Amino acid sequence: MKPAVDEMFPEGAGPYVDLDEAGGSTGLLMDLAANEKAVHADFFNDFEDLFDDDDVQ
């Protein structure tokens, strides 16, 4: 027996929207743009060698 949606998410569906309700992918993209989050002003991109595998042994 598979759990029902209300058992998996007791607080409700939240901000997630069915693609049909959002008016297709265009509506979904508009929703994403409207809910865009800003990065904190004190956040610095200080990730030196994130993709550098030369130091991996």
Curated annotation (Swiss-Prot):
Component of the CSN complex, composed of COPS1/GPS1, COPS2, COPS3, COPS4, COPS5, COPS6, COPS7 (COPS7A or COPS7B), COPS8 and COPS9. In the complex, it interacts directly with COPS3, COPS5 and COPS6. The keyword Transmembrane helix does not apply. Component of the COP9 signalosome complex (CSN), a complex involved in various cellular and developmental processes. The CSN complex is an essential regulator of the ubiquitin (Ubl) conjugation pathway by mediating the deneddylation of the cullin subunits of SCF-type E3 ligase complexes, leading to decrease the Ubl ligase activity of SCF-type complexes such as SCF, CSA or DDB2. The complex is also involved in phosphorylation of p53/TP53, c-jun/JUN, IkappaBalpha/NFKBIA, ITPK1 and IRF8/ICSBP, possibly via its association with CK2 and PKD kinases. GO terms for cellular component: chromatin; COP9 signalosome; cytoplasm; nucleoplasm; nucleus. The modification Phosphothreonine is found at T26. It comes from Mus musculus (Mouse). GO terms for biological process: cellular response to UV; positive regulation of cell population proliferation. Signal peptide: none annotated. The keyword Nucleus applies. It is found in: Nucleus; Cytoplasm; Nucleus, Nucleoplasm. The lineage of its organism: Eukaryota, Metazoa, Chordata, Craniata, Vertebrata. The gene is Cops9. Keywords: Cytoplasm, Nucleus, Phosphoprotein, Signalosome. Belongs to the CSN9 family. The Phe/Asp-rich domain at the C-terminus is necessary for its incorporation into the CSN complex. This is COP9 signalosome complex subunit 9.
